[in-house]
UniProtKB/Swiss-Prot annotation:
This is Large ribosomal subunit protein eL13. Component of the large ribosomal subunit (LSU). Mature yeast ribosomes consist of a small (40S) and a large (60S) subunit. The 40S small subunit contains 1 molecule of ribosomal RNA (18S rRNA) and at least 33 different proteins. The large 60S subunit contains 3 rRNA molecules (25S, 5.8S and 5S rRNA) and at least 46 different proteins. One of its GO terms (molecular function) is RNA binding. It comes from Schizosaccharomyces pombe (strain 972 / ATCC 24843). It is found in: Cytoplasm. Pfam families: Ribosomal_L13e (PF01294).
Length: 208
């Protein structure tokens, strides 16, 4: 490592038969070749299916990275339900499922539901048994064409909005208290509904 700041000059003091612990990677070019051959073998074996599955477009956590969009692990159960795909069928047609991820905004839900719908519009499912197609299987694929792409529905970054002058309304808007109030409103939704129901029952009892 190059010396770039002030400090003690590195001097490795070797002890304990250090030659035994030296690790070499002379097989790196061979491994690279075998990995490539394995990818080609897999692609030929599963053809005409795509090698990589479709992935959801997600935003990374933390304020540092959350303006970017990247590929996630799998689609949420809520996204699959909105797109009309069952959890069990999804994994059989190249749609990965991640039961842990949650949709925290309507935008993320709609974005990934749209991705699933576009994917399903281009998807051709061959029947397991020839001549016995099930619901959703393709019956006539004579006019179908195979499309070669680098990735299944590649993820593109969202357009960055130009900076705008801060308005008086934006200055007066209190984001923290607004979010806090909304969370409190959602938290007591059940209690509020129960109270209103009780009030309505009491009003009905008085009428009688």
């Amino acid at each position: 490592m190059a010396i770039h700041v002030k400090g003690q000059l590195p001097n490795a003091h070797f002890h304990k038969d250090w030659q035994r612990y030296v690790k070499t990677w002379f097989n790196q070019p061979g491994r690279k070749l075998r990995r490539r051959q394995a990818r080609q073998t897999k692609a030929a074996k599963i053809a005409p299916r795509p090698v990589e599955a479709i992935r959801p477009a997600v935003k990374p956590p933390t304020i540092r990275y959350n303006m970017k969009v990247r590929a996630g692990r799998g689609f949420t159960l809520e996204e699959l339900k909105a797109a009309g795909v069952s959890r069990r069928v999804a994994s059989t047609i190249g749609i990965p499922v991640d039961h842990r991820r949650r949709n925290r905004s309507e935008e993320s839900l709609q974005r990934n539901v749209e991705r699933i719908k576009v994917y399903l519009a281009h998807l051709i499912v061959f029947p397991r048994k020839a001549g016995q197609p099930k619901k959703g299987d393709a019956t006539d694929v004579s006019g179908a064409e195979q499309t070669d792409v680098a990735a299944v529905l590649p993820i593109t970054q969202e357009a960055v909005e130009e900076a705008k002058p801060i308005t008086e309304e934006a200055k007066n808007f209190n984001a923290f208290s607004t979010l806090s109030n909304e969370r409190a409103y959602a938290r007591y939704a059940g209690a509020r509904a129960a109270f209103q129901k009780k009030r309505a029952e009491e009003a009905e009892a008085k009428k009688k």
